[in-house]
Amino acid sequence: EGMLISFGKSNYINKAKQQPNKVKDVINKISTDGILETVNAVRSKLEKPIPLGYSNVGEVIKVGSSVKDIKVGDRVASNGPHAEMIAVNQNLCILVPNNVKDEEAAFTVIASIALQGIRLAKPDFGETFIVSGLGLIGLLTCKLLLSQGCNVLGIDPDSERCDLAKSFGVKTLKIGNNVDQVNWALNLTKNVGVDGAIITATAKSNEPINLAAKACRKRGRLILVGSSP
């Protein structure tokens, strides 16, 4: 979502730089449809609102003819955007059990993103992992790692996020200027390094990846769940 918001605030030139393949399409369209038609089409596309969000819960009000096992009136969780009414493919929906509240089911897709990062990291009982970025997905990643018997370190520039993670058992470090997070991680692992790093932060540079790699032991696992150049 942060990337979408940042993209939306960019001017046309910066948007073009971020989508070089689309620029080629624009050039081809100019040769076939002319400049004015192309300009109007591009402007319409770039100024079209994009719904945010990717995790919701709601009641089914209509189903397609080929949909199976989901019917009108069912309560489902999906990866659709935040809106009053949405259309979602069946393979991106799941029935919500009766004993699960809407407030709990709303975490389904977000938690699955965190869980996918953990699945790729293949943590083992007693291993130490560092989570870079303690936003919603980062915090869920920490909790899931703790539930698997891992030691969890968390880093984030926001002190409130660090305090929240610390409240359920994560060793945290508020990062900023002159903060050596690599030595901090090495000191907590007796200079061995962490067994793995999961990056759930959105960054404009490769710094989170580079620092996470330095904090890992030899043959440690590095998983990028967030975004980095």
Explain the meaning of each model-derived region.
Residues V63-S65, P81, L134, S227:
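Short, surface-exposed secondary-structure boundary micro-motifs
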Residues D163, F168-P229:
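Glycine-rich cofactor phosphate-binding loops and adjacent beta1-alpha1 units
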